[in-house]
A protein has these predicted regions:
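Short, positively charged, Gly/Tyr-enriched micro-motifs
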Residues: 1-59, 118-124, 156, 299
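Short, conserved catalytic/metal-binding motifs centered on acidic residues
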Residues: 14, 28-29, 37, 41, ...
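Active-site-proximal, Lys/Arg-enriched surface segment
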Residues: 38-119
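Long, charge-rich low-complexity segments
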Residues: 48, 53-64, 345-367
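Short amphipathic alpha-helical "interface-anchor" segments enriched in bulky aromatics
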Residues: 83, 203, 210, 214, ...
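Electropositive, glycine- and tryptophan-enriched low-complexity nucleic-acid-binding patches
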Residues: 97-155, 239-250
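An internal, acidic/charged active-site-proximal segment
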Residues: 128-240, 324-336, 361-365
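Basic, amphipathic alpha-helical segments enriched in Lys/Arg and hydrophobic/aromatic residues
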Residues: 289-346
Length: 367
């Protein structure tokens, strides 16, 4: 990644500054005295980035800090789709943009699939995959699992987003050790047909459910209907009403083993997956902004945010470690925002921040 003898470290510094400050390459190049022009940076990226190669390099970078000895045995893994709203046309191929439910005034998105592991209070992103229009969920899952296989991660439990609640995806999960996927209420509200009838239950129980698809046929699987009461919140004036959660539970493990799992443990196992939602909020704090149509630059923006999130997880774990082995104790004052500020100050020290504006004509001292 070098053009016009431009050092790689200079390109990285500008990208990091744009990411940690939630700004664009254009803004950082105009704000830093030692930065080249934004067109130069974009030219280097345009000539250096290729989508498939970039995806592999990103995943290798995500793995770089992992110690294989700490990730032996079966892992609990969360899989999700990240939709970045897009208001524009595709750069080269129409399949770069994937359609979905309306969000932020558009139905067009750049979509990324991620695999995320939670172990001993460490939440780490292991792989990223660029999802194209028309790519099936099974193909997405195959791609993510191939990255995990290459890393040597063995998955004992898949925790998937409700977007994966389809016949094809559940059939894929049924060939894995075990998977928990929340179901979506479908059917008539009046007659409580379809899966909507499960959500109307006032008690917890196991049941069988058959899902139909015009393209993928029918699939019968176990469902856990969990009727639970929420714990009272300090801020809430009164106790929240009870809710009914419905999970599809599939996999190669025996049905008896699955039913032995208590409803509380099932909800707790899936609740840990919600760490991925807070991680995405933090990712948005560290994602550089761009109006470029380039899918490579869009992927790079998400990748930098994921790498920074992983770096913070590693640093925070180190600050929480005590003198004795085991899980860390207490809380840490080392916040994600703190890491972003440090990186911003580091780049400003290297490249010098513009602190004055040159005026072409004398300016009045009063309005």
């Amino acid at each position: 990644m070098q053009e016009n003898n431009l050092p790689l470290t200079l390109v990285v510094d500008v990208l990091l500054a744009a990411a940690v400050n939630n700004t664009s390459i254009e803004h950082e190049c105009s704000s830093l005295e030692g930065a080249p022009s934004a067109n130069t940076i974009r030219g280097v990226l345009r000539s250096s980035l290729e989508l498939q190669q970039l995806e592999r390099q990103v995943n290798q970078a995500l793995w770089a800090h992992l110690n294989p000895r700490h990730w032996k045995g079966l892992q609990k893994v969360a899989v999700d789709l990240v939709e970045v709203p897009y208001h524009g046309l595709a750069a080269k191929n129409l399949d770069e943009i994937r359609r979905g439910q309306a969000k932020q005034g558009t139905t067009h998105f750049h979509v990324f699939a991620t695999v995320y592991v939670v172990r001993q209070h460490r939440r780490v992103t292991l792989a990223l995959h660029y999802v194209r229009q028309g790519e099936s969920l099974v193909s997405v899952l195959d791609a993510l699992k191939s990255w995990l296989d290459e890393l040597g991660i063995q998955v004992g439990l898949w925790l998937a987003d409700r977007a994966f609640c389809s016949v094809a995806a559940l059939r894929w999960f049924s060939k894995q050790p075990e998977a928990i996927v929340p179901m979506v209420a479908r059917g008539s509200k009046a007659s409580l047909s379809g899966s909507r009838g499960l959500f109307a239950s006032k008690q917890s129980y196991w049941d069988k459910y058959t899902m139909h698809s015009e393209t993928d046929g029918a699939l019968t699987f176990d469902v856990a209907v969990v009727h639970r009461y929420s714990k009272p919140s300090r801020s809430a004036a009164k106790r929240l009403p009870p809710t009914t959660l419905v999970y599809a539970v599939v996999g190669k493990r025996l049905q008896r083993q699955r039913i032995r799992r208590s409803f509380a443990s099932l909800v707790e196992a899936y609740r840990r997956r919600f760490g991925i939602e807070s991680s995405y909020r933090q990712i948005n704090q560290a994602r550089l902004r761009t109006s470029s149509r380039s899918p490579e630059l869009r992927l790079l923006a998400v990748a930098i945010a994921l790498l920074l999130r992983n770096l913070w997880t590693l640093c925070r774990w180190m600050t929480l470690l005590g003198s004795s082995p085991g899980r860390p104790c207490g809380d840490s004052a080392f916040r994600f925002r703190t890491l972003l500020r440090w990186i911003s100050r580091m780049v400003e020290t290297r490249l010098a921040l513009h602190t004055a504006i040159e005026l072409s004509v004398p300016s009045p001292t009063k309005f």
